[in-house]
Design a protein with these regions (language model features):
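Short beta-strand His + acidic residue motifs that chelate non-heme Fe in jelly-roll/DSBH
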Residues: 49-50, 68-69, 85, 91-97
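A generic "binding-loop/recognition-motif" signal
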Residues: 44, 54-55, 73, 89-90, ...
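Conserved short histidine dyad/triad with adjacent acidic residue
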Residues: 38-53
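A short, N-terminal "cap"/entry segment at the start of jelly-roll beta-barrel domains
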Residues: 1-34, 114-121
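Short acidic-glycine-tyrosine-enriched beta hairpin
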Residues: 72-87
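A short hydrophobic beta-strand segment most commonly corresponding to one strand
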Residues: 40, 84, 99-114
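Glycine- and acidic-residue-biased ligand/ion/polar-headgroup-sensing regions
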Residues: 56-57, 61-66
């Protein structure tokens, strides 16, 4: 079986709100049977609106600074930080830095639905 390589610059990103682009790098379209992974690019001030999933989501910030929301708690994180949003728990992120933030995301399923939640953070 050949290696299925995803070149991030060749992937069409999808807008996830003003200043936020998500690129799925591994999912069912790349042959995955049980995982979805991707990269989210947030421009300064860009916000991933609060939402939930039926499954957990792992996140790792590789560049920039974010204010994150998980449940009813917030924190400010810098590159080199990872966190988990358990299944059905509201979470979101806002770029509070001066430059682009780059976030790696991963889910333990190829079926990932997002459900918006109307909360402020």
């Amino acid at each position: 079986m050949p290696i299925n390589v995803s070149r991030h610059d060749a992937i069409q990103g999808e807008s996830r709100g003003p200043g936020v682009v998500r690129k799925l790098t591994v999912d069912k379209s790349t042959g995955a049977g049980g995982i979805t992974a991707g990269v989210v690019y947030l421009e300064p001030g860009g916000t991933i609106r609060p939402h939930t999933h039926l499954i957990e989501e792992a996140m790792t910030l590789v560049e920039g600074r974010l204010k994150i929301l998980v449940g009813n708690e917030t924190d400010e994180v810098e590159a080199g930080t990872s966190w988990l949003a358990p299944a059905n728990m509201v979470h979101g992120a806002r770029n509070i830095g001066d430059g682009q933030a780059v976030l790696i995301i991963a889910y333990p399923s190829i079926e990932v639905g997002a459900f918006p939640v109307d909360v402020e953070f």
